[in-house]
Structure formats: structure tokens, C-alpha cells
Amino acid sequence: MFRNSYIQQNSDIQAAGGLVPMVVEQSARGERAYDIYSRLLKERVIFLVGPVEDYMANLICAQLLFLEAENPDKDIHLYINSPGGSVTAGMSIYDTMQFIKPNVSTTCIGQACSMGAFLLTAGAPGKRFCLPNSRVMIHQPLGGFQGQASDIEIHAKEILFIRERLNTLMAKHSGRTLEEIERDTNRDNFMSAEAAKEYGLIDEVINQRPA
């Protein structure tokens, strides 16, 4: 059950020339092998790795819902290393994070850019983290369309609507004003982990686990 949930992530890693480690566990019933991501899922750890797109978003949402059904009162830990991607795919993850009962703690490892940064900031208050050398980038949504002038106008209005919605939610989660978010996302805005904390995108920069 767990193994199938990470087919896409595993394929991405293998395509990059790596292999997904397997973990063998001993029990009274004998040995059982898990890929490392499936084993971590048993510990309520989810990895969001790579571009945010529909297939990956569906897997993330399914895992969030599954872990809620397993235990609605225990935190879920979402680790993010993403350059961003589809707004609609990202919003499906965002809505599911807000919908389920467990708190979703978010941690940036590597990078959280664009939609990745949005999801990082959407974690439960007080439970949003970055590792010290992570990079965070926020900007306005990107879009392009070709066709008749009337259709281009329709899509331009949709992009403006999406931008306003994302900015409003970012302001809500970061504690910044809407005007500040609009100004600071006008162009690509890269931040260190400490700068992301000062801006309100995360709560803490963590160097190591508490003793």
C-alpha cells in the first residue's frame, strides 16, 4: 500500500541516476521490505520533492487523508524540496492541509520556491521550519496564453485573480500586509532561511533536532 504511493517520486530519483534505498524490518511474521519513503510514511513523514504537478499533488493529498484516518490527533510532517509548479495542483495540497484535522508541520530542505514556498508557509503556526542552508523564493504566478484576443483577456483576468488569491493567503499565513506581499512578490524574491523567518514565512531555523 505504501510502496505504490511513491512511484512518481521514486521514478524521479531513479531518472536522476539514484536508487531508492530499501529498509528491511523484522517482525513476528517474518521480514518485510519497504522503500525508504514508504517506511517514513509510517512515521507520518511525507516528502514533497520536485515540481508541483497534478499527479504528485494527488499522491500528497491521498497520503494526508490516509494519515488523518490513521490518527486524526497526531501531527503530520511535510518535508519540501521543490522549485514550484502548477498553482492548481499546489492549491489542492493547500486545501487538503487546511481541511484535515491533524496539524501539518512543514520543513524546507534544499529549496522551497514559488508554490513550494506557499505550501511551506501554509504549515501549522509554530510548526514551520527551514534547515539552515535552505533557500526560499516567492514571486507572482506566471502564465502565458496564445489565441484570440477575447480568450487572452479571459486568461489574463484569471491570472490576476489567482495572484490576488495567493497574495491574500500568503499575507494571512505570514502576518504581512497584502500591500507588502504584492510589493515583495512583484519579482523573484530569494531569501535565506533566516530571512524567511524574519519575513514570517517560517517560524524557526533548525540546525539539529532537540536533545
From Swiss-Prot:
Enzyme category, top tier: hydrolase
Stated EC number for the protein is 3.4.21.92
Q: Which UniProt keywords apply?
A: Cytoplasm, Hydrolase, Protease, Serine protease
Q: What is its main location?
A: cytoplasm
Q: CDD domains this protein is in? A: S14_ClpP_2
Q: Which reaction does it catalyse?
A: Hydrolysis of proteins to small peptides in the presence of ATP and magnesium. alpha-casein is the usual test substrate. In the absence of ATP, only oligopeptides shorter than five residues are hydrolyzed (such as succinyl-Leu-Tyr-|-NHMec, and Leu-Tyr-Leu-|-Tyr-Trp, in which cleavage of the -Tyr-|-Leu- and -Tyr-|-Trp bonds also occurs)
The record, for SUPFAM superfamilies, names: ClpP/crotonase
> What GO biological process terms does the UniProt entry carry, in alphabetical order?
protein quality control for misfolded or incompletely synthesized proteins
Answer yes or no on keyword Transmembrane helix. no
GO CC terms, sorted: cytoplasm; endopeptidase Clp complex
Tree of life domain = Bacteria
Localization, per the record, is: Cytoplasm
**Subunit:** Fourteen ClpP subunits assemble into 2 heptameric rings which stack back to back to give a disk-like structure with a central cavity, resembling the structure of eukaryotic proteasomes.
Q: What is this protein called?
A: ATP-dependent Clp protease proteolytic subunit
Q: Which organism is it from?
A: Pseudomonas fluorescens (strain Pf0-1)
